[in-house]
Swiss-Prot record:
Represses a number of genes involved in the response to DNA damage (SOS response), including recA and lexA. In the presence of single-stranded DNA, RecA interacts with LexA causing an autocatalytic cleavage which disrupts the DNA-binding part of LexA, leading to derepression of the SOS regulon and eventually DNA repair. Gene3D superfamilies: Umud Fragment, subunit A (2.10.109.10), Winged helix-like DNA-binding domain superfamily/Winged helix DNA-binding domain (1.10.10.10). Belongs to the peptidase S24 family. InterPro entries: ArsR-like_HTH (IPR011991), LexA (IPR006200), LexA-like (IPR039418), LexA/Signal_pep-like_sf (IPR036286), LexA_DNA-bd_dom (IPR006199), LexA_repressor (IPR050077), Peptidase_S24_LexA (IPR006197), Peptidase_S24_S26A/B/C (IPR015927). Keywords: Autocatalytic cleavage, DNA damage, DNA repair, DNA replication, DNA-binding, Hydrolase, Repressor, SOS response, Transcription, Transcription regulation. GO terms for biological process: DNA repair; DNA replication; negative regulation of DNA-templated transcription; proteolysis; SOS response. GO terms for molecular function: DNA binding; serine-type endopeptidase activity. This is LexA repressor. The record marks 87-88 as: Cleavage. It comes from the Bacteria. Pfam families: LexA_DNA_bind, Peptidase_S24. The active site is at 122 (for autocatalytic cleavage activity), 159 (for autocatalytic cleavage activity). It catalyses: Hydrolysis of Ala-|-Gly bond in repressor LexA.
Length: 203
């Protein structure tokens, strides 16, 4: 990251690591706590530097409004875009790679990470918007509360995962939508493809 100052590099690396671990970006307060900034103004100063250099976008009025726009020069690897996820009413899954995103998969903690494009607003309360690209880390064993990409009857959807004994719920993050509920008999038609590892928003 030759074009970034030392502090900007530290801020950017923390944003990437935090997003990879949690599936959403850190708040300014979390940046301050992690990097020892005494004032939010210091964090905002370095975030503005990253924004001016095209690394991030910061949405006003949002607690977690940081969006990564690019990775450092020289970062290797690209994330395959394998189709679209329906956030709301699922659409037919596209199995072949449609495109790639110029983002290093290593930032998301998985060499097998792939991306999908969101359609709809059923995850809007999780700050996932129509047109966003969600990075998925493959796993078949999600934890309750994880946001997962699930294949249901050959269609892909993005939802919160919750399992209670022999019952699985795929829950939206929008009060206008109802959860999908499945019993053990339905499991043959429900397959978790992976958990959300990050989000990319193009502007």
């Amino acid at each position: 990251m030759e074009d970034l100052t030392e502090k900007q590099s530290l801020v950017f690396e923390f944003i990437m690591e935090y997003t990879a671990d949690h599936g959403y970006p850190p708040t300014v307060r979390e940046l301050c706590d992690e990097l020892g900034f005494k004032s939010p103004n210091t964090a905002h100063f370095h975030l503005k530097g990253l924004k001016d250099k095209g690394y991030i976008q910061s949405a006003k009025g949002k607690n977690r409004g940081i969006t990564v726009l690019k990775t450092p020069p020289g970062a290797g690897g690209k994330i395959p875009l394998v189709g679209r996820i329906a956030a709301g009413a699922p659409i037919l899954a596209v199995e072949n790679v449609m495109d790639t995103l110029d983002v290093d998969r290593a930032f998301f903690g998985s060499s097998d990470a792939f991306s999908v494009r969101v359609e709809g607003d059923s995850m809007i309360e999780a700050h996932i918007e129509d047109g966003d690209y969600v990075v998925i880390k493959p796993t078949a064993t999600p934890r309750n509360g994880d946001i997962v990409a699930a294949l249901v009857n050959d269609e892909v959807t993005l939802k919160y995962f919750h399992r209670d004994g022999s019952r699985i719920e795929l829950r939206p993050a929008n009060v206008r939508y109802k959860p999908f509920c499945y019993t053990e008999e339905d499991f043959i038609d429900v397959r978790v493809l992976g958990v959300m590892a990050g989000l990319i928003r193009k502007v």
